[in-house]
Amino acid sequence: MIKLSHLAKIFATPQNSVHALDDINLTIEDGDIYGIIGMSGAGKSTLVRCINRLEKPTGGEIFINDTEITKLSEKQLRSIRKEITMIFQGFNLLQQVNCLRNVCFPLEIAGVKKQEAEEKAYELLELVGLKEKALSYPIQLSGGQQQRVAIARALATNPKVLLCDEATSALDPNTTNSILDLIKEINHKLGITVIVITHQMNVIERICNKVAILENGKVVENGTVEEIFSEPKSEAGKLLVYPDVTKEDELVVESSYSLKIRFNGAEAANKPLVADLASTKNIYANIAYASTKSIGSKAYGTMILSFASEEEKIIAQEYLKNTANIIVEDLSKKGE
């Protein structure tokens, strides 16, 4: 388990002081895939560098299991860091050696014999689907393949925690998804705790079970992915989860007979509610606004429907109320 308690980091300049992290409190359980998301400058990378103590916090505490690491000596930190590994946006592979030697590198530093290191490296390259590329050089690989080698290298020392700092930002969407699926598979197979630093909500949506949203160095919201997606409370959360949510008010005024439907984990990700209304009640709704996401088989988000008359709106409201995990709000009464 990783616990951050009142963590702070201040960068001092001749002109002023920048609070990169301000009173961060988070608990990351063993086996979590924990997403940390925010816009540029939110403090994400500073936070991850504090977790592995590449950056020394200004204040607060960091517990790795039961060990508080902010006051450890460099020698003590080296022992802790063996349990924490990291992959980056830029892969950071050694270009002058092949993939096998890249994966062997941390093992050789740790004093593992060459034959044993190579056997382990081949196993890891097979795990990431690149055993046949063992003797290829990084320049001969695609970006996604290079990141797979970087992941294999990161796993060489049997870490308990994998830090991913914008690990898919430089990749195309299809390659991004394949890398995310690999990380999720590694989490399940090896039980490694994963911390994902990203500015992309689709990354959180695809693999994370929990998420914290950072803004100006502060955690403005955290919880399970389902909780945050169903009803983000902070302005930063709303902007990240549903970036076009501000359009709601502009669209509502176009109809006096409107309902706001909030999907709160409904088993309706693939259920055609509007089509069902038409077929069962002979009511044809206009979709004035929709911003929804599917996580697993569940739907989260908001939809605004407008109707031709008050009578149609009331019938639709009664019908929709019978669908589990859907909250229906009569927008025509909102201003009364």
Language-model-detected regions and their locations in the chain:
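Short coil-to-helix segment of the ABC ATPase nucleotide-binding domain corresponding to the Q-loop/switch region
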Residues: 97-104
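Conserved signature/switch motifs of ABC ATPase nucleotide-binding domains
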Residues: 136-139, 157, 164
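ABC ATPase "signature
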Residues: 222-223, 231
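Helix-to-loop junction immediately C-terminal to a conserved catalytic motif
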Residues: 52
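Conserved ABC ATPase "signature" region
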Residues: 67-68, 104, 108, 115-132
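Helix N-cap at the start of a conserved alpha-helix in ABC-type nucleotide-binding domains
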Residues: 173-175
